[in-house]
Amino acid sequence: MRNFSAASCFCSVIWPIILPANLKILVAMTGASGALYAQRLLDNLNPREHEIHVVQSNYAQQVIAEELAGGLKLPDGAKLHNLKSMNAPFASGSNPPDAMVVIPCTMGTMGRIAHGYSEDVLLRAADVALKEKRKLILVPRETPLSLVHIKNMELLLLAGATILPANPSFYSGAKTIVDLADTVVARVLDHLGVKNDLAPRWSEEKE
């Protein structure tokens, strides 16, 4: 008799998430190094086409101060939410975002999301995105990874999240740190369904 694992059972019921052209999107920043990734994502989301919300963990604010000269620059109309306020619309399943990106994502945040912790609005929004079957993209930067990290990623993948590690592409001919960051951000935009030419595509270069 054939044995079915829990993983195979869960995978069989995960359906592709179809995103609208005009997104209500939440960009969440945690305390991992790599604030530039979040800044470049915000730079390339058109506020005339998308409703943009931002939330930051306490340590994210410290990283922003250390890594982004002049601080985080928000698109026109973007709303910055209080981490401790549960009055944000995406804190309820009745008004979830179309998509949420945690960029960069610490392993601590990933572990809390994987196990359903919701002690602040960032974690609650991720919990809502999962339970309402909305697009959730997590961009971890940690290396190397422990077995605990891998198991947490497995749980999140089975729950429907996308794990998109911040691994820059070096075939793009990048000349600056921003160019390298853009190769990651381009993949995030791709998974959001946002058309972009932020980084060269494979085989676009002259043969």
What are these regions (language model features)?
Residues 18-207:
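A cross-family phosphate/adenosyl-ligand binding-site feature
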Residues 9-11:
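Cysteine-centered motifs
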Residues 6-7, 21:
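Ala/Thr-enriched low-complexity intrinsically disordered regions
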